[in-house]
């Protein structure tokens, strides 16, 4: 069966994440210890025990999600002889998850990936003062209608399309006032709209200071060609070229995540199953809304790991 392996982004973090996996598999415990050591931080304790308020901070949530995903990959490798180059036709990650995908595919070491996403989280949080920015999900509009709403709402401020998640689920990001106007305009057009509980306006032009920091961070990073083609967020196209991947990771900081198109690329290339690796079930749910011909599963708990091993 042809499979794509995908990796979740911010929003999927919850206290207790990874704890059952660490209890069941020594390989997962070892992975969490490696991340703790790379960051000089007891991140695994924060993941397992909270407090939730600290885990939700962008600079902690991002490496925590990376660690949760890579722990699953490590267990599959150690317990089942999993080789991503043989088992995956593609890898992709939603926003932060793109770094997890690259590490899983051998382009980044665990330590390098952990340090990069910690720096990314800090840079994104500092780019815009708390309260200045906001994000909202527009539900029931197609991409062109959402773009028209964002343009009308801007009024000299920033209101960009941040995520094209699935048909009828578009996220906008920018100045709080502009995003609130977008919510009102979307509702006037018969859509539902929800302000999102985020600490910064991700994937919009207000993140330019963070993009500058990531340009510097990635220039200092040894990134190898992934062993599996990456479907990049901002291109919704495959790449395996390290210099191009670095540029796309920088662009991803300020540009829209083209998730719907990425999943359609899987379907167009005869992928049959999309496997979400790590915390939560967000991406598997989106896959099913994008293309019902694709099967999708989430793998983060010990029983889910064991079930996947049976079919690989």
Question: Which stretches of residues belong to each language-model region?
Answer:
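Alpha/beta catalytic cores of group-transfer enzymes, especially the acyltransferase/condensing modules
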Residues: 10-13, 39, 105-255
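Non-catalytic positions within long, well-ordered alpha-helices that form the structural scaffold/packing
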Residues: 267-270
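Post-His helix in hydrolase/transferase enzymes
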Residues: 311-312
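Short hydrophobic/charged patches on amphipathic alpha-helices used for structural packing
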Residues: 260-264
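Soluble or luminal CAZymes and related metallo-dependent hydrolases
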Residues: 27, 254-258
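Short, flexible segments with low predicted structural confidence
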Residues: 3, 7, 237-238, 259
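FabD-like malonyl-/acyl-CoA
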Residues: 1-146, 196, 273-306
